[in-house]
């Protein structure tokens, strides 16, 4: 599926700093940048203390999107930001299940075991590679000093897969607003037969697009059931249904992908958008 495609996109970057303090500052900047990315998308995630592995270095952290289908097992506190790869917490011979319910090592709350999908990894490499490459720079005193390196990677296409794994139901995808392919789907029932419906759908479509929203107009000849199932499968956050109710009393139905619904006057765009933003 999407998680293990033959092609993937990665964002990799490196930093080269004059000293350890400068590396720490850059590291925190990148850490906060990755946090911003995940928060803007709308994902539930944890920053996990990790083993640097074969890459080496002084410190590393992984960014995990929480999902029951995740390949990694992580231990988190129920009362703080503490999170760590279980392999770093387990003692020889211990089973993962033995960690559940134990006091958190940071003294706050108890340990819970969760599954996560790793979408990012950041490292403080220090001088490990710079020394081998003889990567030196003159400091303020004019003396040669070895650079301190940092390494930062985030899986761009893996973020999409993780978002799907975390946000879905038996009908299909439930996209977070931040990365949904469309914000709104206008389902026009009888578009090709009723001029009142087609004109209203076209007008609302144009208005919402002019306001900066990504909007699709489903003007196919298919019935309501087919159109709604397709929209739920794709995961568009809001459906606006223009059909029989509109012909009878000028009302449209608003239906969020998360299940909430409401009837609304077609001319009250503010209420429509408030409904969208709150779902």
What do these predicted ranges mean?
Residues 1-279:
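NTP/phosphate- and nucleic-acid-binding module
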């Amino acid at each position: 599926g999407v998680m293990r495609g033959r092609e993937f996109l990665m964002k990799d970057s490196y930093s080269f700093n004059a000293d350890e303090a400068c590396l720490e500052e850059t590291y925190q900047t990148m850490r906060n940048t990755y946090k911003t990315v995940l928060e803007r998308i709308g994902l539930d995630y944890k920053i996990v203390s990790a083993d640097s592995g074969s890459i080496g270095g002084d410190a590393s952290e992984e960014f995990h999107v929480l999902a029951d289908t995740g390949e990694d097992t992580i231990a988190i506190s129920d009362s703080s930001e503490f999170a760590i790869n279980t392999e770093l917490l387990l003692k020889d011979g211990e089973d993962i299940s033995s960690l559940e319910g134990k006091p958190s090592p940071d003294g706050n709350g108890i340990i819970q075991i969760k599954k996560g999908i790793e979408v990012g990894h950041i490292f403080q490499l220090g001088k490990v590679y710079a020394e081998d490459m003889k990567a030196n720079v003159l400091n303020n005193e004019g003396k040669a000093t070895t650079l301190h390196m940092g390494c930062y990677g985030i899986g761009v296409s893996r973020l999409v897969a993780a978002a799907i794994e975390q946000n879905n139901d038996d009908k299909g995808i439930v996209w977070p607003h931040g990365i949904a392919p469309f914000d709104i789907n206008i389902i026009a029932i009888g578009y090709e037969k009723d001029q009142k419906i087609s004109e209203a759908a076209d007008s609302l479509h144009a208005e919402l697009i002019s306001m900066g929203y990504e909007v699709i107009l489903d003007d196919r000849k298919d019935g309501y059931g087919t159109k709604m199932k397709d929209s739920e499968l794709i995961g568009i956050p809001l459906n606006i249904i223009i059909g029989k109710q509109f012909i009878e009393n000028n009302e449209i139905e608003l239906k969020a992908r998360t299940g909430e619904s409401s009837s609304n006057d077609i001319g009250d765009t503010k209420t429509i958008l408030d409904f969208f933003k709150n779902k």
